[in-house]
From Swiss-Prot:
Residues annotated as signal peptide: 1-20
Entry-linked CDD domains: legumain_C
Name of protein: Vacuolar-processing enzyme
Tissues showing expression: High levels are seen in the flowers, a lower level expression is seen in the leaves, while very low levels are seen in the stems and roots.
Covalent S-S links between cysteines: C253-C267, C430-C460, C442-C477
Natural source organism: Citrus sinensis (Sweet orange)
Active site: H178, C220 (nucleophile)
GO MF terms held by the record: cysteine-type endopeptidase activity
Keyword Disulfide bond annotated: yes
Keyword Glycoprotein part of the UniProt annotation: yes
């Protein structure tokens, strides 16, 4: 291996290890015993209680969205397929489940089990039977918003299914992909921005076409999508894989314990996602509340105070007293498996930073490929292309900060984090404009570059506009790199 390859490998290993801070406390000390929580919420916790035992009260609806493509992002579509199987076993009908996924994983040439997707090292196929509602180029922001709003006339392509809900219905939305401060990835064209998503949820509430809505969100910095934006009073309860400033984590990854079967070179799931689904898989969900699951997922996703993230909750927290059955149904096979602490907390899972999972895939693919084969050469090329793109984006953003604010003030302004409870940016239109300006001169941010959204938001918050940003970007980037990660073939991300 060349010196450069060795150096990059060391960089990768350091990145995958993360930064351990022995003083931090991810899980905190607020985990109640499930029995105590159950008594609190059912014997005087306050507020109106949904009759979770009455199937005749409203219809359950679900929207499941995997926002990525590419085999290195296997885990996101695996999460979504697993969620579909869980909901079907819970009694939801296909007509009430809308699935968005690119669908390039099951029959991908990299898949060691063609036509099969697994979400656990010893798991069953979760791909079989999943409806192809919106796949490929139909997985767009516009179609997702139209589906949530029940706007059939805005749809072309796909199955045409929408959330055609009524005032007594309950809606569950689950998203899994990469994210960044204020933004969620999509496999086509532009990304989902927090202000637009919140506007859609407000419109859905104003229509009077649901009784309550639960949103589970798997992405890096996912707390920033709701923090300071999702207000009480919309009958919406949301939990996120991480707070507004940190990465979420992939799990069941190569080299970890437990890891995927040896023929796999990619992570099978995401830590927050498998935490809530593996909990739901084994319990009678008539006896478990959203709050109980939140606490359990919070503990497991924190990896018991090692590597992990802070699971957060937003919106109408009072809805968390509702049983999961209200949104997910329940598998009759679990009728005798009441939620109690002794059978709920699973062993800790090792995890990989969400943004490093693609590098891990390329490295594992390279490591396993026989010497001198095209596969080994391809893996090496993919690895170096990804690393080169990362270095380009990081350098460009840092240089733009210094050009705009000076060598000393630049890093300080770019890295500023607003106090908890405040939204990421004052002017979302400015943020989107600066994203387009940066990408016009420097190339696509990509799933990795989304991490710099806070820096671009901070530039907006200082009053810098499009013209000054264009001038600095032109100085920082003489041209757009030719690699696939920088390509703008699919358009701008804003």
């Amino acid at each position: 291996m060349t010196r450069l390859a060795s150096g990059v490998l060391i960089t990768l290993l350091v990145a995958l290890a993360g930064i351990a801070d022995g003083s931090r406390d991810i899980a905190g000390d607020i985990l109640k015993l499930p029995s105590e929580a159950y008594r609190f919420f059912h014997n005087g916790g306050g507020g109106a209680k949904v009759n979770d035992d009455d199937d005749s009260v409203g219809t359950r609806w679900a929207v499941l969205l995997a926002g990525s493509n590419g085999f290195w992002n296997y885990r996101h579509q695996a999460d979504i397929c697993h969620a579909y199987q869980l909901l079907r076993k819970g009694g939801l009908k296909d007509e009430n489940i809308i699935v968005f996924m690119y669908d390039d994983i099951a029959f991908n040439e990299e898949n060691p089990r063609p036509g099969v997707i697994i979400n656990h090292p010893h798991g069953d196929d979760v791909y079989k039977g999943v409806p192809k509602d919106y796949t490929g180029e139909d997985v767009t922001v516009e179609k997702f918003f139209a589906v949530v709003l029940g706007n059939k006339t805005a749809l072309t392509g796909g199955s045409g299914k929408v959330v055609d809900s009524g005032p007594n219905d309950h809606i569950f939305i689950f998203y899994s992909d990469h994210g960044g401060p204020g933004v969620l990835g999509m496999p086509t064209s532009r990304y989902i921005y927090a202000d637009e998503l919140i506007d859609v949820l407000k419109k859905k509430h104003a229509s009077g076409n649901y009784k309550s809505l639960v949103f589970y969100l798997e992405a890096c910095e996912s707390g920033s999508i709701f923090e300071g934006l999702l207000l009480e009073g919309l009958n919406i309860y949301a939990t996120t894989a991480s707070n507004a400033e940190e990465s979420s984590w992939g799990t069941y990854c190569p080299g970890e314990i437990p890891g995927p079967p040896p023929e796999y070179s990619t992570c099978l799931g995401d830590l927050y996602s498998i935490a809530w689904m593996e909990d739901s898989d084994i319990h009678n969900l008539r006896t478990e509340t959203l709050h109980q699951q939140y606490e359990l997922v919070k503990t497991r996703t924190a990896s018991y105070n090692s590597y992990g993230s802070h699971v957060m909750q937003y919106g109408d927290i009072g809805l968390s007293k509702n049983n999961l059955f209200t949104y997910l149904g329940t598998n009759p096979a679990n009728d005798n498996y009441t939620f109690v602490d002794e059978n709920s907390l699973r062993p800790a899972s090792k995890a990989v930073n969400q943004r490093d999972a693609d590098l891990l895939h390329f490295w594992d693919k390279y490591r396993k490929a026989p010497e001198g084969t095209p596969r080994k050469a391809e893996a090496q090329k993919q690895f170096f292309e990804a690393m080169s793109h990362r270095m380009h984006v990081d350098h460009s953003i840092k240089l733009i900060g210094k050009l705009l604010f000076g060598i000393e003030k630049g890093p300080e302004i770019l890295n500023t984090v607003r106090p908890a409870g405040q939204p990421l940016v004052d002017d979302w239109g400015c943020l989107k404009s600066l994203v387009r300006t940066f990408e016009s001169h420097c190339g696509a941010l990509s799933q990795y570059g989304m991490k710099h959204m806070r820096s671009l938001a901070n530039i907006c918050n200082t009053g810098i506009g499009k013209e000054k940003m264009a001038e600095a970007s032109a100085q920082a980037c003489e041209n757009i790199p030719s690699g696939p990660w920088s390509s703008l073939d699919k358009g701008f991300s804003a």
